[in-house]
């Protein structure tokens, strides 16, 4: 059964501007494992990765029903690629499966998260 679904859309230019200012967004949004992946990428891919993870965590919080805040924070959610390169929610506070899709264009990233409980 679907518990919740969340969708988010983030402009890459917004993330690029924040990163260009030298603000500590990656440390706030990304877990240590995500930061390790982020740091290996060239700048253009860092922007895409950061925007994707930010958007995905926002979408997750919407599916969870709380938004980002006291109940669930950015560090509570971890999204890493599996061996085939598919993003997976590897750590999160919900007690059921979390399904994720991340899609990029030249200017935007769109994410969807579905939280499942029990059998469909």
UniProtKB/Swiss-Prot annotation:
GO molecular function: holo-[acyl-carrier-protein] synthase activity; magnesium ion binding
Binding-site residues for Mg(2+), renumbered to this chain: 8, 58
Main location: cytoplasm
EC number per UniProt: 2.7.8.7
Top-rank taxon: Bacteria
Alphabetized InterPro entries for the sequence: 4-PPantetheinyl_Trfase_dom, 4-PPantetheinyl_Trfase_dom_sf, ACPS, Ppantetheine-prot_Trfase_dom
Family: Belongs to the P-Pant transferase superfamily. AcpS family.
HAMAP family: AcpS
Protein name: Holo-[acyl-carrier-protein] synthase
Organism: Lactiplantibacillus plantarum (strain ATCC BAA-793 / NCIMB 8826 / WCFS1) (Lactobacillus plantarum)
């Amino acid at each position: 059964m679907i518990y919740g679904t969340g969708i988010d859309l983030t402009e890459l230019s917004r993330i690029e501007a924040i990163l260009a200012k030298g603000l500590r967004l990656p440390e706030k949004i990304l877990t240590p494992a995500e930061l390790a992946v982020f740091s290996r990428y060239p700048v253009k891919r860092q922007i895409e990765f950061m925007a994707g993870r930010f958007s995905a965590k926002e979408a997750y919080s919407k599916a969870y029903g709380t938004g980002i805040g006291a109940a669930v924070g950015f560090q509570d959610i971890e999204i890493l690629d599996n061996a085939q390169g598919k993003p997976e929610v590897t750590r999160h506070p919900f007690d059921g499966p979390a399904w994720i899709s991340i899609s990029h264009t030249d200017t935007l990233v769109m994410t969807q998260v579905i939280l499942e409980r029990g059998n469909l």
